[in-house]
Amino acid sequence: MMGIQILPPQLANQIAAGEVVERPASVVKELVENSLDAGASRVDIEIDKGGSKLIKIRDNGSGIPKDELALALSRHATSKLHTLDDLEAILSFGFRGEALASISSVSRLTLTSRTADQTEAWQAHAEGADMAVKVMPAAHPVGSTIEVVDLFFNTPARRRFLKSDKTEFTHIDEWLKRIALVRGDIHFTLTHNGKMVRNYRPAMNEAQYLQRLTQVCGRPFAEQALKIECQHDDLRLSGYLQSPWSPVISDTHYFYVNGRLIRDRLVNHAVRQAFAQKAELEQPGYVLMLDIDPHQVDVNVHPAKHEVRFHQSRYVHDYILQALQSALEEAGELNFVHSSSLDEVEDVFVDAPTSATEISAPFVLGADSAQVNVPADTLESAQPLVASAVQVKSAGAGREGTSFGTQTNAFGSMATPRDNSRGSYSAGESRQRTELPSKAAIASYGALLQTPSYSVKDQDYQPSLPMPAILDGQYWVMATADKLSLLPIKSVALATRCQEIEAKLATGLIGQPLLMPVSVAADADWQAVLDEHDTLIRQLGLELTIRYQQLIIKKVPPYIRESQLAKVIPEWLQSLRFETPAPSALAFWLAKHSLTGFVSAPEIWAAFSQLAEEKKQLIANKAILLPWQSWLEEQASE
């Protein structure tokens, strides 16, 4: 029997890695969470061969000072907490200080970082049995980049248990979807084997968040989802719940506590209990986010932090259950009209005449009792609905206690309820149903008939201007009042293209990969220029790398794809040495190089017509005034 001894640092870290680093997705999780804790607004994830060859995480967070780089790769070293009180009120993702040390013990890890206070970046990596950390200068913008190369290279047994590259990347992609839902304010990109797979742009408003919800959970879930928003004391529940009338069974089951994704049987039970009397769905889909006082939840109960323990679990369960039940009740009864109003709507439709010729204008009075002219085809289309309304009332009379209603879903359209009665189905029978209109849908149609007819006067509408005559293929002949002028078509094309590009620069241009990358001899300081202006280069849709003193141009925005890239890009990089161009200057640069070939006058005029009046006037001021009056006087005098 061997005596008791202290384990070598590398072996101790490898043992700890057994809990922290299960597979490449675990590495991505730990490193991205560190980026989020550092206040990053953008995180770029680059994966090669499912993560077994390369995992590269780049962020624009606060960075790590040079003096702390060595500590960052040491065990039990963290900036997230310092006392037991901090642990009991933890809100950050990481707090144990084990991730980087554990990952570096089973891979070749390099950490490059720079803070805003530093003039240069520093790079650190650990090697050897004692895991000694070496720090050296490097080029890098504010933020951090972590490269994990050859995961499990020194633990062959662990490497053999990895699945195929496709399977491992699927786990990474699935984890990114989960974090993208709760951190809508972060711009995430995911690249696999050099190809961008995911690009989750920041969702700064509800409409943008719904787009992200559609990207992650799919359109069937997003279109039918019921929005949840409630608060009681220190508890706040928000998110989206699958409609009980959704025809699709969703596998979306995401629950977050203070922004941390967890697996919890408590919330699953609350959801099933809320739906027990509402739908046939055995396990409805949901994206729920619970905000709670951090003192009321213990996040340090699972090695991978997948579970938490609530101090008052029964209270939390009942709160979630009540919130979901309230949302489902509103979905079926309170969204459009109350039950008392539904009876009145039924009476209106039942007592209405059954032929289109008998439906008179008073039947579709507006709110101000003004008559509305309804086209005959609209009246004819209303007749079948009137008959359907009578059928609904008679059918509903025999089903007391059944609630019909509609719920406005996440996209503002109506989620149609379905019959809650359970039926048996044969093996070849479809589960789809032919449903009658609900009472709330009938009420909505009645409100639609009360809408005044469309009038162009009601909108600030301006028809497209007719294109003026073209002179010599270069000018538009502009006639205004008693003035005649020539407007250069190319100057208009340049101005409209600048407006188009500048509007797109706000969210970033999409680069197009070149069939054959362009290679140019690189200057010695170009790598520093690329690192310093990395965000700007990505914003333009450019992908530039330097290898063996050669600048490799892989992606460019469509505006300069046809230009001489071997000349245009190096000239632009030279200008970056002296100043960072403003968005207007970037737009002008791209527009100038995009208009080197043939331009279509009708397309340019159409773009010009869509500009605001003040911008049109600025462009029109470039027109060359023709002295036609003096010319006529000269002709008359002759």
Swiss-Prot record:
**Keywords on record:** DNA damage, DNA repair
Gene Ontology biological-process entries = mismatch repair
Where are the residues of the annotated region Disordered? 398-435
Q: SMART domains, from UniProt? A: DNA_mis_repair, MutL_C
Annotated Gene Ontology MF terms? Answer: ATP binding; ATP hydrolysis activity; ATP-dependent DNA damage sensor activity; mismatched DNA binding
Per the record, its GO cellular-component terms are: mismatch repair complex
SUPFAM superfamilies referenced in this protein's UniProt entry, alphabetically: ATPase domain of HSP90 chaperone/DNA topoisomerase II/histidine kinase, DNA mismatch repair protein MutL, Ribosomal protein S5 domain 2-like
Q: What exactly does this protein do?
A: This protein is involved in the repair of mismatches in DNA. It is required for dam-dependent methyl-directed DNA mismatch repair. May act as a 'molecular matchmaker', a protein that promotes the formation of a stable complex between two or more DNA-binding proteins in an ATP-dependent manner without itself being part of a final effector complex.
Q: Which NCBIfam families match?
A: mutl, PRK00095.1-1
Regarding protein family, the annotation reads: Belongs to the DNA mismatch repair MutL/HexB family.
UniProt cross-references to PANTHER family, sorted A to Z: DNA MISMATCH REPAIR PROTEIN MLH, PMS, MUTL (PTHR10073), DNA MISMATCH REPAIR PROTEIN MLH1 (PTHR10073:SF12)
Query: What is the protein named?
Result: DNA mismatch repair protein MutL
The organism named in the record is Shewanella baltica (strain OS155 / ATCC BAA-1091)
